[in-house]
């Protein structure tokens, strides 16, 4: 059976920054760098000299996201064409780990090596959330237009929303009404999300997906509004396992070839200078390094990526907050770990995913109490989804998998909200929209999703309430 994919990004495993990850030891000395966005990040790659295996290990961690992205692209749809997810998962789904019940995905690989590519997002009813997260090939979120922040430089604010993704160094002229979206690499990935309000809403979302347009700039100019046809979803491949199966020579040769197409950022120059001693450069080759050294570096690097734990992770009232994803600077360890656990990590301003790890004990009934005015602060919407220990949705006769989004929660007379968390169907005194089923026995997790969270959620001024026994 092929391993399951993760539902928040398009990745492999279930517990992103979950409890139980091993502590991570930095690669020798620690250097600090400043990302192109201006934020300071801790580097996981030392610029000090070292033996060949140590340097190659650092290079593996550095290049892992690039190689993983390329393998994922290779097994995806053709470039500059959308592929759409069309269904909401249920407990019978055993493909996606930690799937969400809130959005449908529309994905497209971009190839800008010939010319810019135009994306048009259709107009839709007010209040429907959408996000067109666009990552460079190093998994940094390079652009993130959304319904909350459409980032238009021109055109109608109510849609359609028309953007042109520009390759590095492009200085041509765009037609009026198209917002430029420069990208740092000539290949990139759009991971689009569109809000869906339950099964009955699927036809409306399918129509929106069908209204997404993507085309090379020259084709768009010749026939405005026309786009490349959507692609059939390709067979699922486990890119993480494919990369894990590469020997040292295969991995580093591929990394060097890819860096010639999608170059690293200027801030990476110190690390690249160190790797150059082994021939690991854009378009280069590590051919002079013994195969056993490269194979050992791959094994060491794989262990470092798998066992990474970011010291910036936070636990608030029992809820685990991962460190900010999507913009990594020179924190190469975090970048590689997030890529392995699930490509498509959001920027905090687009989504937060506090996660609670629990176990059923006592009478098996728990409660989440939101004080008046203290529901999750968002500019879009929020939800809480329950998962079994294996990360899949929990079977229950009512087919209830989440609360907060598809049905409005009921408030108490004082304006507070109580969510009842238990396996048994609640009494009539509890609103159906306020019940979240969990397993009868054993471990479970809750993931709270905040779409377009407000600043108070991002800086932790607002804190989620603790899960308590009833």
Segments predicted by a language model, with ranges:
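Small-side-chain structural scaffolding
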Residues: 19-21, 26, 31, 56-59, ...
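A compositional/structural signature for long, glycine/proline-rich flexible linkers
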Residues: 44-470
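Generic alpha-helix initiation/capping and coil-helix boundary signal
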Residues: 12, 19, 33, 49-52, ...
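General helical structural elements
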Residues: 16-17, 38, 90, 453
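Compositionally biased non-globular segments, especially hydrophobic aliphatic-rich helices
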Residues: 29, 43-44
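Bacterial lipoprotein signal-peptidase II cleavage site
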Residues: 33-40
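N-terminal secretory signal peptides
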Residues: 1-10, 14-28
């Amino acid at each position: 059976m092929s391993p399951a994919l993760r539902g928040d990004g398009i990745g492999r495993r279930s517990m992103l920054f979950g409890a139980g990850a091993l502590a991570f030891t930095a690669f020798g000395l620690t250097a600090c760098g400043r990302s192109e966005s201006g934020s300071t990040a801790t580097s996981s790659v030392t610029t000090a000299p070292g033996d060949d295996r140590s340097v190659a290990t650092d290079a593996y961690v550095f290049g892992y996201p690039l190689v993983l992205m390329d393998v994922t692209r290779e097994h995806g749809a053709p470039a500059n064409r959308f592929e759409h997810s069309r269904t909401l998962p249920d407990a019978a789904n055993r493909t996606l780990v930690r799937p969400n019940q809130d959005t449908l995905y529309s994905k497209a690989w971009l190839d800008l090596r010939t010319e810019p590519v135009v994306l048009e997002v259709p107009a839709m009813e007010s209040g429907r959330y959408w996000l067109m997260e666009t990552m460079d090939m190093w998994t940094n979120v390079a652009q993130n237009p959304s319904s909350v922040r459409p980032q238009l430089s021109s055109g109608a604010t109510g849609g359609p929303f028309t953007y042109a993704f520009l390759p590095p160094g492009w200085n041509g002229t765009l037609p009026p009404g198209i917002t430029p979206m420069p990208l740092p690499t000539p290949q990139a990935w759009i991971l689009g999300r569109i809000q869906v309000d339950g099964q009955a809403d699927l036809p409306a979302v399918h129509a929106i997906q069908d209204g997404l347009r993507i085309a090379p700039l020259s084709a768009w100019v010749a026939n405005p509004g026309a786009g490349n046809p959507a692609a059939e979803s390709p067979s699922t491949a486990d890119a993480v396992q494919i990369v894990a199966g590469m020997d040292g020579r295969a991995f580093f040769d591929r990394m060097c070839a890819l860096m010639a197409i999608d170059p690293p950022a200027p801030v990476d120059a110190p690390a690249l200078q160190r790797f150059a001693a082994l021939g690991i450069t854009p378009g280069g080759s590590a051919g002079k390094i013994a195969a056993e050294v490269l194979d050992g570096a791959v094994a060491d690097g794989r262990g470092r990526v798998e066992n990474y734990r970011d010291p910036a992770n936070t636990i608030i009232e029992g809820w685990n907050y991962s460190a900010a994803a999507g913009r990594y600077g020179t924190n190469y360890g975090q970048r590689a770990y997030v890529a392995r656990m699930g490509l498509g990590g959001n920027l905090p301003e687009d989504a937060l995913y506090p996660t609670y790890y629990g176990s059923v004990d006592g009478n098996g009934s728990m409660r989440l109490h939101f004080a008046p005015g203290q529901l999750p602060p968002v500019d879009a919407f929020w939800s809480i989804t329950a998962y079994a220990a294996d990360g899949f949705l929990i079977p229950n006769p009512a087919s209830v998998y989440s609360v907060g989004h598809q049905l409005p929660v009921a408030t108490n007379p004082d304006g507070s909200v109580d969510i009842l968390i238990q396996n048994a169907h609640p009494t009539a005194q509890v609103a159906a929209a306020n019940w979240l089923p969990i397993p009868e026995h054993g471990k479970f997790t809750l993931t709270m999703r905040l779409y377009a969270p407000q600043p108070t959620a991002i800086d932790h001024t607002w804190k989620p309430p603790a899960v308590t026994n009833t």
